[in-house]
Amino acid sequence: MQHFEVNYDGLVGPTHNYAGLSFGNVASLANAKATSSPKHAALQGLKKMKALHDMGMKQGVLAPQERPDIFALRRLGFHGTDSEVLYRAATEAPAIFQAVCSASSMWTANAATVSPSADTANGKVHFTPANLTNKFHRSLEPQTSGRILQAMFNNGRYFEHHTHLPDNEHFGDEGAANHTRLCREYGHAGIELFVFGRYAFDSSKPAPKRFPARQTLEASQAIARLHGLSEDNTVYIQQNPDVIDQGVFHNDVIAVGNQNVLFYHEQAFTDTESKLAEIQRKFGEHPLHFIKVATEQVSIQDAVNTYLFNTQLITPPDGQMTIIAPTECQENDNVRSYLEQLTQSADSPIKRVEYFDVKQSMRNGGGPACLRLRVALNDEEIAGANQNCLMSDGLFNRLNQWVEKHYRDELAVDDLRDPALLEESRTALDELTQIMKLGSVYPFQQD
């Protein structure tokens, strides 16, 4: 039996815009109110997916969510026709209105936490959608995320789906952006690392002061229980509160892991040495590489500005571990120099770096790692999943045509109130569910 890590990238939605909604995300705030290009963003994302597919990687696609979220606005007391609801909300509560238009579901690292069958007690792949309670615009996502994931992984023999955690900050969960897995091979039992920002029930513990800690220890522990993980294959690590206050809002902005490699900044965690020792002890006697980037090599500011760690660390079929990095890393002399030294070092397990232009996503604070949800699967599980969500030459061409047909070239924040945009988006998503054989996953399809 063969085993793979499949990257499911989020397809950028038709309302991709720069509203600056994410406090604690430096890039999101810096580009607030700029004009976006939904079409360009979606095509950029598809190009990256196709490139990884062409490298021999298993690559999937995760559908976007329905926006503007008319149903959320109606729950908040805006009545009338859809056009009237849009107008009233945009006029009377513009901040709320912009939030329900967000295309943030494109960052599928926040869609869910996934545990592969090799790690779980019942031998199934487990999915728990993230509740994303810290940001209103993202807290609207988990129910639809759950329906989409169930439509993608729709065979109960292999897959088990859980309801997202309670919608409360005590159980704030940001999904795979605060979770990584170390293993020898993808099909072998691994160590799942849960990184959290604060203790929900103990205010005496360290916590950031400037920006919020979005993930709690208690949420991470709950996910591990739901997924049937054990003490022997889990490690809980607190993120350094000081780096959260410098704009590191998720662990995947300061660390990334793949197979037997953990690539991290020296300021990423609290109690680093004891936690690395715990990882090593639970990993066993097999080779394990901890690649520490010192502050004198790359500053926190450079790490955040270039998203050095919000890169994809992958193992293509040729076995040459590769970093998939945004072009911002290439454009920063210091970071580019570091990556050149890293990949040229004889004792480094990371051998290549490939640069991709994902600037439409980067301007909203999401790099290559934000755009993908990693799912370790064996060939039987892949065969048991929805085949229409796996990248191929045919799907790539079909989705490019779909984007060209339905997406706008430019979108300003003021354009979000246009009733035509809602209809354009619904028409596009209805067609997409047919292309990807998802069924009626969107609220407007169930209305």
From Swiss-Prot:
PANTHER family: N-SUCCINYLARGININE DIHYDROLASE. GO terms for molecular function: N-succinylarginine dihydrolase activity. The gene is astB. GO terms for biological process: arginine catabolic process to glutamate; arginine catabolic process to succinate. Keywords: Arginine metabolism, Hydrolase. Belongs to the succinylarginine dihydrolase family. Disulfide bonds: none annotated. InterPro entries: AstB_sf (IPR037031), SuccinylArg_d-Hdrlase_AstB (IPR007079). It holds the Pfam family AstB. Its EC number is 3.5.3.23. It catalyses: N(2)-succinyl-L-arginine + 2 H2O + 2 H(+) = N(2)-succinyl-L-ornithine + 2 NH4(+) + CO2. It comes from the Bacteria. Homodimer. Signal peptide: none annotated. It comes from Idiomarina loihiensis (strain ATCC BAA-735 / DSM 15497 / L2-TR). The active site is at E174, H250, C370. Substrate binds at residues 19-28, 110, 137-138, 214, 252, 364. This is N-succinylarginine dihydrolase. Catalyzes the hydrolysis of N(2)-succinylarginine into N(2)-succinylornithine, ammonia and CO(2). Pathway: Amino-acid degradation; L-arginine degradation via AST pathway; L-glutamate and succinate from L-arginine: step 2/5.
